[in-house]
Amino acid sequence: MAGSRRRQWRAAATCVLAGSLVALVSACGVVTTKEDRRAAEELADKHFPGQIKAIGARTLFPGTGGSEVTFAVADDRDAVVRLRINAEKGTCDGKECAGVLKEAVARGRAEADAYRILRDAFDACGYEVIALGSPGAAPYVVAELTNATVQRELAGIGGCVQRWVAASGADSPLAKAKASYVNVVSPAVAEKRNRGKESWPTMMRLTRGNLIASLTKHTHHAASYDIVDGQVDTAGRARVIRPFKESQAFGKTVQDAVREELRATYPNVVMTTYQWVWRLEPGRVDRQTGYLLFCPEPDERGRCVNSDDAVLVTADEHGNPVGQIRIVHDVREGTGALRLPPY
């Protein structure tokens, strides 16, 4: 990387000695994000005059070349248009730019339309959508899940999902899906989120990586709802999503405890670090059930690889097992996929 930068600086210095800034940009091929943005604005003025306005630009990953330029849409407060352009090559996503921009504008408008269907469905039953991640990803809503409220809140969100499915239309990907998912964060976490600027288009604010990061750095829940022929099982089920360090600590606690219990039957037992989805027990947020994998005997290197044995365990929020564990054998197809029984 350092050598590459030195070569770029040597090339730039040669150009400066040879001539003007124009020579630096065009003859030497050193095109900045500023030039990419200017080229994108000229493209927009030509093909969508007065309809879209550039509001930001970022350099794409080093080595790919070009920049991503972001546009607001004049007649749609929610829509955002993203164009990846390489002014040096005169291409957008490696293609002819006019067509790519046209597709980007259409996509931005369609995503805004889909967002409004989602927003209205959840607004109608009292839940605000505060983040989306990437377009089409599970939305984030706010609710306080406690033992006293979890079933009611999950059912309420499930009612929103049913409205969302119905409003999306029978031929929509959502209506044809087997399930839908909603992320649930607490009011305290939502209050501290990175909100961005109100002047930004809605789809720009709600899909930003730093917004999602400000939510997911805290423990939250993901609710799932089965869909059959457009009808949603509104009761739903929820699982716990923990930040990495908390997940590791939880996993170590439950694995250590289960290992000790298994040693009564398998003195040489070896646990894997694998953790299955930890689903909340019905009506509880302080009880969650999931699978751990183990080997009754280690391999010749002292490891547990391609385990065919699992244990189903219910634990408290800290990872301490509660109640009896259940051992399940033959959970893997040969050395391939797991086939853990549902629970």
Predicted regions and their residues:
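Extracytoplasmic/periplasmic C-terminal soluble domains
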Residues: 141-255
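Long, acidic/polar, low-complexity amphipathic helices and coiled-coil-like
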Residues: 85-190
